[in-house]
């Protein structure tokens, strides 16, 4: 392969495009890993909340009537008491319509009922959150997996293209090295590259043009021969028609003898002239001979002088007769000048 500036520009543009694609893919991969880190953090937060809820449930069963000393448990108990107060307000509205009962057992049962309801509500809310986060994380994981697969495929394609470009560049460099070696060898030999290449190109062009001319002339000769053969066939058909017309003229003469009152002009129009057809045939035959002779002479003069003696006569007469003719012709062609030469 020949190394040209256009090829180099194309290779550089391909490498620039591949670098841009690699940068885009690295950005996508970074975003993918960031999303994975975010989802992992969310999962860890959810697990922490679940663990906290489990601890709260365990402690609520053991510490229903005992106040906690730690500030964290106090904060959780405050939240539980606020929720209990709201629930107690709702229950007080309902209890106004009912019968009056002792305050101490009613308060204890309402507190236990409110705690159980609060725990159930908290658990339901946590389960709903967990389901929501699970579905959301599953969708994100699917999207990220598809993006990751697309990114890996694109990276593989880019790597393949890079390998192909590297191979092409290596081959071009090898070609350049071989050309440099050849040029150095030619310079050592003292040959002019420009002159040698120009002469070779000129000779090739001349040979190609001569071949074209020969082919065109042969095609023209074939066409002319075909046209002449077609015309000869037409004239043969016309000659046959004239013979048939002559037989018809004899019949017409007999009819004239039978019908003397018929007009002579009508019969003369039917009988075609005899001499014109033969004259046309002779003219065409002479033209055909002239064309063939001129074509052979042109071919002998411009292309091959031994065409008749080495090809045509061998095919027409045979090798034996041609050798006999050569032996008969040799004494007339050889000049006896040995006596005139100095001894």
From Swiss-Prot:
Swiss-Prot/TrEMBL keywords: Coiled coil, Membrane, Transmembrane, Transmembrane helix
Membrane topology term: Single-pass membrane protein
Ranges of Basic and acidic residues composition bias in the record: 86-99
Keyword Transmembrane on entry: yes
Coiled-coil positions: 152-238
TM regions (residue ranges): 284-304
GO cellular component, one term: membrane
Subcellular location: Membrane
Disulfide bonds: none
Region called Disordered, residue ranges: 86-108
Highest taxon, organism lineage: Eukaryota
InterPro entries recorded: SMCO2/5
UniProt keyword Coiled coil, yes or no: yes
Name of this protein: Single-pass membrane and coiled-coil domain-containing protein 2
Originating species: Homo sapiens (Human)
Gene name linked to the record: SMCO2
């Amino acid at each position: 392969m020949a190394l040209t500036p256009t090829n180099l520009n194309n290779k550089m543009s391909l490498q620039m495009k591949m670098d841009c694609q690699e940068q885009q893919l690295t950005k996508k991969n970074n975003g993918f890993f960031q999303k994975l880190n975010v989802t992992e953090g969310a999962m860890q937060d959810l697990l922490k909340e679940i663990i906290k809820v489990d601890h709260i449930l365990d402690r609520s069963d053991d510490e229903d009537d005992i106040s906690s000393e730690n500030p964290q448990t106090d904060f959780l108990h405050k939240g539980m008491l606020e929720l209990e107060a709201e629930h107690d307000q709702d229950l007080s509205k309902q209890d106004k319509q009912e019968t009056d009962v002792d305050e101490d057992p009613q308060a204890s049962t309402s507190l236990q009922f409110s705690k159980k309801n609060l725990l159930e509500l908290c658990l339901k809310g946590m389960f709903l959150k967990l389901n929501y986060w699970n579905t959301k994380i599953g969708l994100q994981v699917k999207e990220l997996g598809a993006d990751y697969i697309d990114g890996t495929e694109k990276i593989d394609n880019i790597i393949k293209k890079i390998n192909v470009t590297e191979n092409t560049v290596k081959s071009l460099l090898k070609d350049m090295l071989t050309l440099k070696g050849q040029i150095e060898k030619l310079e050592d030999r003292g040959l002019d590259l420009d002159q040698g290449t120009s002469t070779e190109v000129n000779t090739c062009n001349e040979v190609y043009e001569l071949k074209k001319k020969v082919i065109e002339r042969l095609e023209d000769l074939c066409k002319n021969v075909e046209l002449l053969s077609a015309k000869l066939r037409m004239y043969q058909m016309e000659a046959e028609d004239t013979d048939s017309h002559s037989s018809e003229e004899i019949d017409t003469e007999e009819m004239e003898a039978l019908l003397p009152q018929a007009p002579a002009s009508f019969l003369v129009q039917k009988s075609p002239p005899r001499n014109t057809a033969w004259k046309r045939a002779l003219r065409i035959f002479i033209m055909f001979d002239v064309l063939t002779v001129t074509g052979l002479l042109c071919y002998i003069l411009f292309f091959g002088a031994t065409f008749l003696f080495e090809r045509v006569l061998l095919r027409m007469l045979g090798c034996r007769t041609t050798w006999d003719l050569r032996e008969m012709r040799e004494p007339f062609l050889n000049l006896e000048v040995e006596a005139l030469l100095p001894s």
